């Protein structure tokens, strides 16, 4: 997984027109949760290999793109699939939840475990009055 840091607005829009699948992280250097998320993204990049790109966009360097993407809370995460916003999330996401969302974006959701059958017959005795 490549981490692409601070593409221009034109480069970002080009990625959308090329129908790419990637995670866009809108951040600021002065934002505490953004700094925490950057460590999570580095770990995920190491673990997930070359399956998806992470694009980091500094809101202070690309204010027009930030406004166009309607970023009001940072970090702002956009899960892009085939050039379209599949989902978005505002704020910090723990590693496990972020990784699960990326797997879903890639179509690699883990199988859902079937819950054991816990149905029982109910018998009511007596009428009570």
Give the role of each language-model region.
Residues 26-30, 129:
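Aromatic-flanked redox-active Cys/Sec active sites in thiol-based oxidoreductases
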Residues 22-26, 41, 54, 64-65, ...:
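A short, hydrophobic beta-strand/beta-hairpin element that forms part of a small beta-sheet core
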Residues 1-20, 97:
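N-terminal leader/targeting and pre-domain segments
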Residues 31-34, 77:
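The canonical Cys-X-X-Cys-His
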Residues 35-49:
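Typically the conserved alpha-helix immediately C-terminal to a functionally engaged Cys/Sec
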Residues 113-128:
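Beta1/beta-strand and adjacent pyrophosphate-binding region of the FAD-binding site
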Residues 8, 58-60, 92, 128:
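Conserved acidic residues
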Residues 72-110:
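Non-catalytic, surface beta->alpha helical segment in thiol-disulfide oxidoreductase systems
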